[in-house]
Amino acid sequence: MTRVVVVVPARDEEATIGATLRGVCASLDAARAHGLVEDAVVEVTAHRCVDATEARARAVLRGRPEGRVARDHAAATVGQVRDEAARRGLASLGGPPSRTWLLSTDADTRVGLRWVGDILREADRRSVVAVAGLARLDRWQGSAAGADAYSAVLAAKMRTEGGDALHQHDHVYGANLAVRADAYLDVGGFSHTRHGEDQALLDALVAAGHPVLRTRAIAVTTSGRLRGRAAGGLAEHLARIDGLTPHSPAAAARRAADTPR
């Protein structure tokens, strides 16, 4: 069986952190019931929060021995938050890194009941040390034209059927990324850069020759908001796509700002 560390960075996510953690715990319970998980820890980091995120996380995890909530006002980037949480979890669990998996998600994301189990099964079946899944939006919050543009961006990064079975898409989401701990440590973990720590980690694994699965079969549901918490995160990416369409609210706001008064 496998040890699992689930990493959940959270910044002012009081409205969504409860659903995120309930989903993570249910998925861990299901994986345990199927004999896939021996021990686990859920590492939540309340990063520079000014709302009730920390309190709500503690309330959801009360009575769950695997639940741990840390308060962090020092880390400069979400990459640093993810990395430090991963290393805390590994230190807490102990045991060989080759038998421990790090699963990363976000505090505005809902994972399914099979999430943990599917990752571990697919990793074993495909003989890989990292699994990059997909993230579906709960609701598009931009314009109709922006929604079409986003769909086109998604489709452009999907690989055709019948190609490399390990490389089914070119997307990377910190909300749905798993890495075996020995491989994670081998490449230095999540970078502490301003953004793009998920892509950088996957690129480092590939460059080091570690086998990686980019699968369409494992997906989570994440917020479709256009204003997020992390610089360079998904919300900023969505807003940029929406802003490029001529009839979007973002484009209208930009035109208004550029209009002389």
Where are these regions (language model features)?
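Short, flexible, basic/aromatic active-site loop/helix in glycosyltransferases
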Residues: 148-169, 242
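A conserved acidic beta->alpha catalytic loop
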Residues: 14, 43-55
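Short, well-formed alpha-helical segments that are part of the catalytic scaffolds
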Residues: 13-34, 55-56
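Acidic donor-binding loop at a coil-to-helix junction in glycosyltransferase catalytic cores
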Residues: 195-201
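Conserved donor NDP-sugar-binding/catalytic core segment of glycosyltransferases
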Residues: 114-146
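Short beta-strand/loop segment that forms part of the nucleotide-sugar
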Residues: 33-48, 71-74
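Acidic donor-binding/catalytic loop of UDP-sugar-dependent glycosyltransferases
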Residues: 52, 98-99, 105-121
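Conserved donor nucleotide-binding strand/loop of the catalytic core
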Residues: 54-96
